[in-house]
């Protein structure tokens, strides 16, 4: 990919969307880092930063922690003093980062990067993973709650990404051999309920003065076998409620949710610590209904 290719793509995007006229936000994700000098030419980085600043559009980029340095941020903020940097932290736990995710950096690296971003008055978006490989449902819920609490005060936004199954991956092999089940939607609801007081100390909603951060959850393939799901009967209602909460930050959006399969999850979590293998795998992974659903 040459600089000319990147400039061409950028110019076509601006032309297609009329300089992003009806858009308040522009996300430039390169599946790594816009600030990676070895892959992204400096002149293209500068163009993106300056164009979004001149157009008065909120710019969101991704970066790995090692690309966030004093020198780099000093340079970048000269071209755009107000943008958001999203970091895929995945887990606020060095053991999980090393043995479950193989992330390649530690939480101290994330802490250092966030301190620098805050020094330059840049916004921080933190990605967390819910139920990474080799983790039971109960552990995923416990860790997920703790990680959200740990990063809330240092993050303007927290995006929790429930594990989904992509073909050709290690997690796909575990899934096909009945050693991993994507997370339950009920677990995501429980995580929201347990962390809401840390996001909104006065039980407010998004936009209120008490808001510490914003919690966002949009389950990829939600309600499907390879994404976060319940029994199949209540999935659409629960996914819709989770997504409404992500917009509003109001617990009222989770009221009225009910299904018998919630009891199956509670039993699964209660037995997690006493069985050699986690429950919730195999053909019965959906819970009470659709027991003969085949893997896809």
Predicted features and spans:
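Acidic (Asp/Glu)-rich catalytic clusters
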Residues: 15-21, 48-54, 74-82, 115-119, ...
